[in-house]
Swiss-Prot record:
GO molecular function terms noted in the UniProt entry: D-threo-aldose 1-dehydrogenase activity
Description of pH dependence: Optimum pH is 9-10.5.
Catalytic site: 58 (proton donor)
Role of this protein: Catalyzes the oxidation of L-fucose to L-fuconolactone in the presence of NADP(+). Also active against L-galactose and, to a much lesser degree, D-arabinose. Uses NADP(+) as a hydrogen acceptor much more efficiently than NAD(+).
Keyword Hydrolase: no
Name of this chain's protein: D-threo-aldose 1-dehydrogenase
EC primary class: oxidoreductase
Record-stated family: Belongs to the aldo/keto reductase family.
Positions bound to substrate: 145
Amino acid sequence: MSSTEPAAAAAGLAIPALGYGAANVGNLFRALSDDEAWAVLEAAWDAGIRYYDTAPHYGLGLSEKRLGAFLQTKPRDEFVVSTKAGRLLRPNPERRPSGLDTDNDFHVPDDLRREWDFTEQGIRASIAESQERLGLDRIDLLYLHDPERHDLDLALASAFPALEKVRAEGVVKAIGIGSMVSDALTRAVREADLDLIMVAGRYTLLEQPAATEVLPACAENATGIVAASVFNSGLLAQSEPKRDGRYEYGQLPDELWDRLVRIAAICRNHDVPLPAAAIQFPLQSALVRSVVVGGSRPAQLTQNAEYAALEIPAGLWAELAEARLIPTP
């Protein structure tokens, strides 16, 4: 696959098949200097990546600011940018001297806090504030960010209709939901009029719970999918799995470890790096428009783009399917 070739179009929006998830330039897990963050983004651009995903949540706005500063140096029609709504950034009255937002894994000052707001006014404010931080004339794609963490019913009654309204007005080109909860994704697809959904860690080479209900719902409603967190917390990021790897911030269950070992062995038999298979697996489904990967070092972006472009033999997918490690096409 080519990272610069649109995999499909949604709402008139061509989504490149490989995207960069910009949480790391918002100081996720470790602090980056402005120069280090710029180098990461430059590496992504040089590797041909033209889809960039961010959110106010990422570094309390730092990701949007850094990404926007970088993208302002590039031709606007040459990239797609998505951000998210549902939480507004407001002054934090409980800010601690020298305090950091490490409770949310971001190494940034905690001078702001996130406030849920699913009203139309809140959605419009979120868009305006994101545009200001990004410094861009428009946002291509807007996701509602993890609404089930607050109130999914309220989101369906208020936030999604607001997203549909701003799309109809041309404020954004396409709308969706970003979540790692299959039930929330399925309900949103069935009860709202969405163009794309971002499925985080639920349709990966290691496990595919989204295949049961989310993908069928998307097929029924002509909704595209952007697959994120495809490395399963890093478990698939190296060709040789590690038993002490973390799974969703906890210990890796024995059952998943056994699956991981079997998948890695089949990849070795076909001379395919495990991370390459992890990046390309979601795109074996015609519903998946793009795969978004992260990274906090330039070399990671360069390598991921190479993995995305690697030619993988059909026999690999056939053997994985025969072993019932991935769904049968």
